[in-house]
């Protein structure tokens, strides 16, 4: 719980004291750390790439796995980020540009959206591959995130467990930042305004979304299951 409180405070301060460009660079840095962390982890395990490719092309749906499947979909696509990308597009004030400039920027935003989804898919795939090559192969059932870190130590060593925890922390911070910005954008849009962190409506949207999410944590008995359900809700939003 204290970790959630500190993360929320850190994100609110970061959003309220930095420009969009600085926040964008910070998110790129966070995601880079996540990607490099899981690349490092994958080098420590033996992956059956033929089975992995088969799973990507012809996935199976075991009984009782629908919750996990939907949560992975929500974690990869993250519909609130689509709202955020829409806000970015509108903020360019296309009415002051010609059609060629508009098409160019729209193509860039399309590429940016697809690229972010591909990166999200790659990171989630890396997590699944890591779990398959360690926990599933060893017949270990993981029921909470802290257990996952602890179980990685005897399997891959202390450094792998620390890197895994660091990657999860960076993932939590980056997703909290984007969800807060998306909420601020949506709330400001209700009043016909664009997202700007100095605007009171944008600030209220950020505080409401992160504050409510933080309060819900106090009522969730099983954080691991709560995480799965929250990501499943994201997939339903699609």
Predicted regions and their residues:
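Select transmembrane alpha-helical segments in multipass membrane proteins
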Residues: 6, 61-73, 121-131, 154-173, ...
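Helix-loop junctions at the membrane interface of multi-pass solute transporters
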Residues: 73-109, 133-134, 185-190
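Loop-to-transmembrane helix boundary motifs in multi-pass membrane proteins
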Residues: 2-4, 159-161, 173, 189-221
């Amino acid at each position: 719980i204290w970790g959630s409180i500190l993360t929320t405070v850190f994100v609110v301060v970061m959003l309220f004291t930095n420009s969009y460009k600085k926040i964008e660079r910070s998110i790129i840095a966070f995601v880079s750390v996540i990607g490099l962390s899981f690349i490092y982890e994958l080098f420590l395990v033996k992956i059956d790439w033929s089975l992995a490719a088969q799973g990507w092309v012809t996935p199976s749906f075991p009984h009782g796995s629908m919750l996990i499947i939907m949560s992975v979909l929500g974690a990869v696509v993250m519909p609130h980020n689509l709202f955020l990308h829409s806000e970015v597009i509108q903020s360019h004030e296309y009415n002051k540009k010609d059609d060629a400039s508009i098409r160019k920027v729209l193509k860039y935003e399309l590429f940016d959206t697809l690229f972010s989804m591909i990166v999200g898919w790659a990171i989630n795939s890396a997590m699944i591959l890591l779990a398959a090559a360690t926990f599933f192969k060893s017949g270990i059932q993981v029921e909470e995130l802290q257990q996952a870190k602890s179980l990685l130590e005897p399997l891959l060593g202390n450094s792998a467990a620390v890197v895994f925890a660091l990657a999860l922390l960076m993932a939590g911070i980056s997703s909290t930042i984007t969800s807060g910005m998306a909420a601020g954008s949506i709330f400001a849009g209700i009043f016909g305004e664009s997202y700007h962190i100095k605007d009171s409506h944008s600030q209220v949207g950020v505080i409401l979304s992160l504050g409510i999410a933080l309060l819900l944590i106090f009522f969730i008995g099983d954080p691991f299951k709560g995480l799965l359900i929250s990501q499943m809700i994201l997939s339903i939003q699609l």
